[in-house]
Amino acid sequence: MQDLLYFIQQLINGLTIGSTYALIAIGYTMVYGIIGMINFAHGEIYMIGAYTALIAITGLAALGIAWLPLILIVALVCAMIVSSSMGWAVERVAYRPVRGKHRLIPLISAIGMSIFLQNYVHLAQGSRNIGFPALIEGGFRFGAEDSFQTSITYMQITIFATTLVCMTILSLFISRSRIGRACRAVSQDLGMANLLGIDTNRIISATFVIGAALAAVAGLLLGMYYGSIDPLFGFIAGLKAFTAAVLGGIGSIPGAMLGGLILGVAESMTSGYLSGEYKDVVSFGLLILILLFKPTGLLGKPEVEKI
Amino acid sequence: MAAHNLKHALFCAIVTLIISYPILGFNLASEGTTVTLEGAKTSTIVGVLLAAVVVFLFQLFRDNLMGSLRQLPAVNPLANRKPMEQSKRLKLESTLLTLMIIGALVWPFIASRGAVDLSTLVLIYIMLALGLNVVVGLAGLLDLGYVAFYAVGAYTFALLSQYYGVSFWFALPIGALLAALFGLVLGFPVLRLRGDYLAIVTLGFGEIIRILLNNMTNLTGGPNGIGGIPDPTLFGMEFGRRVKEEGNTSFHETFGIAYSGEHKVIFLYLIALVLAVITAIAIRRLMRMPVGRAWEALREDEIAAKSLGLNRTAVKLSAFTIGAFFAGFAGTVFASKQGFISPESFVFLESAIILAIVVLGGMGSQMGVILAAIAVTILPELAREFSEYRMLIFGAAMVLMMVWRPQGLLPMRRIHIELKKQE
């Protein structure tokens, strides 16, 4: 019974982290699906979202506003606006001019952008980590009083619920809206979509904006969950999210969700049963293994090499 | 058209404000557990507003600006010059190289101790950049975990000296070979992957090595690192004031000169110089050998190279292993120079810096890479007050370089034969 409760606890923790990875992974997978590049600066956009949310929360607190839903919504909206503008600007400045060149060139440009953004926030806000207030406290507990108890905090429930809502909206947007349909067309064949009158530049920009907005949501959620942020925390999270995207099959949106959840659970099981220090080793190891044995991921389509 | 431009300019200006004002305009300060918000300095806010105005004006008049820029006569005097004849160019290059090496040999005897120490670091970066140049520049394999091989070299020497008392000269080949072995073992499975997947896998590998070094506390000392790494000896002569190991003599006593701490610094510099020159020459030779040609062929067109009978895996693996070998070299020298190493020195940023050197110098071009290594290491030292902006400028330079001049400052020129026109 004890063991089962412990296991369930790790599962819940893993799913919580995993669902936020999934949110970030969407940005990677959509961009890769359309223009076939790894947006290395995506982790930084997520970090900027978290910083903006914290600035908004602190600003509202200074103004004396204490109504929780209002604070959360304002922080969320601010973070999404700033992050999506950042996503748009990054694509415009660093990726559009090098689009279509040799594969390594956009990738190096993206690494440069990632270093630039990291240091931009580092210089503006300092390198120390800053406490993020836990606005949502409390939770449910299961199990006997005197032994190990499984708990689900309200924060975790909020994360699940928000992720679910975001994913539903995204799926509806991709499958029903005009831009969503254009996105799918462009990811199937960019040149053909262009010939058929789709403004591909706008669609690519839209992809970056959508991915950045979802990353900002993850930034706010994970900031509250972990309780502190620093300019470097986007890097590892971005890498994890990329792993999740590859795990699920890069280019596939349901794959990113599945990959995020699997990765989150794998990580929390490692921390729970082995040691927290090795969780990064496990996720990178997982990435290497997947790329070796099933480079298309769980839900990805095999790629045909054309001459 | 004008209305469309105005709308676009306004949009760009607003985006500039959105991405800069919240982050730059408010400073988060934490006192204990409470976080407070402070407004930024007026100068910062004025700067942000000014940036938005500049973006607005630029976008508004972009068509005119670009048009008038194009009408300007070509200012670049080198643009229309005839390429130098190949034999002349090679002669010029070798003269320059000889001069550089002579200059580098004289340098430690005229410069201050600090400058020589810094030059040793420059040489280590040159070795690293030349090694990575083989992998990225010649073979076209983007390796983002190059620092892992550097760490293997450094830790090999540190651990061997700590546990078995192995000296620098024994550890040097062992470190390099072990790093090469790591390259081989890692490369074997991952080199089948496509370019950008390879980048991520090597990045993951680099992080795994660093995390392992950090956590295997009883072997590597964890975050505390390993100290007391011995200096290299010259034929059994030590450079310390007192001889540490039995059977050795000390340098200053043998030659009957006064003890000076500078001897050791100069000696290390010379070792690094010799190794860097060896690295450069070895790679220069390799480039002209069939294997070097195969690297470039594979970089240019994998399918064509394959259909001409090249073994893809073997060619890639050789580049990867040779790159790792030289990183191991550099790592051993680094460990000996610092006398202390910890996982802090082997973070991803270090890989990114080495990559930036290769990219800035011009992928594949040895001369360019050497000059870029010197510039990237020395410029931040010269401009100390800007040192906090170093990485910001690095990142921006990488992006700008890719946008404007992806071939680098001193692009690689292929050795080729020109057909003479028939009379």
What are the residue ranges of the model-derived segments?
Chain A
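Membrane-interfacial amphipathic/re-entrant helices at transmembrane-helix boundaries
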Residues: 1-25, 52, 63-75, 101-105, ...
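Inter-helical junctions in multi-pass inner-membrane proteins, predominant
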Residues: 2-20, 127, 152, 173-178, ...
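Short, non-helical or kinked segments that cap or interrupt transmembrane helices
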Residues: 19, 28-51, 100-105, 179-182, ...
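Hydrophobic alpha-helical segments within and immediately flanking transmembrane helices
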Residues: 20-28, 41-61, 86, 90, ...
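Short loop segments and helix-boundary regions at transmembrane helix junctions
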Residues: 33-41, 85-131, 173-180, 235-250, ...
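Membrane-embedded helix boundary and interhelical linker motif in transport proteins
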Residues: 34-37, 41-89, 93, 149
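Transmembrane helix-bundle core of multi-pass membrane transporters
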Residues: 97-98, 106-176, 203-206, 269, ...
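Helix-loop-helix "hairpin" substructures at the membrane interface of multi-pass membrane proteins
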Residues: 148-229, 253-258
